[in-house]
Amino acid sequence: SNQDEYDINLILAPGIINSVHTAVASKIIDVCEDREDCFAIIDPVIYGKNVGDATEQAETRDSNFAAMYWPWIKVPDSQIGTQRWVPPSVAVSGIYAFNDKVAHEWFAPAGLNRGTIDTAIQAERKLTNSDRDTLYDSSVNPIATFPGQGVTIFGQKTLQKKSSALDRVNVRRL
């Protein structure tokens, strides 16, 4: 975690699921908190879970150096010519990179302008307004499907429990 040796601003480990690999997810967040110059994207649950399972995992964390997103998304796999379900962190990291390139870190990597996941074929679950509210209130950023808009990141909260400016991804990443 030496800042002088490693220049990083984002840490993720697709497939390292908070509900299954709790110690590894904790270590990733610890590194970000120790360095204070990077941010973690943590996948809350394995494929096939529900809103309650995802929010339960967010409740196990309290950090403004990490965020969770849900549900999983289906993307094309050009190497084998099929489609595959991937953890949210796979697509979310691409949205962070896109956002940083076109708008900089101080803008939210979310919403219809900067949060639409162009490579997504579909989200694992079509979230209702109630689902989105439940997730967001629990600090899980919803990945929603909007007619004519596609699959979109629709939240930018960190895992911090206390309300403050640092409970927003764009503020924490400044």
Task: Give residue ranges: language-model regions.
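A glycine- and small-residue-enriched flexible loop/hinge signal that marks low-structured segments
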Residues: 1-174
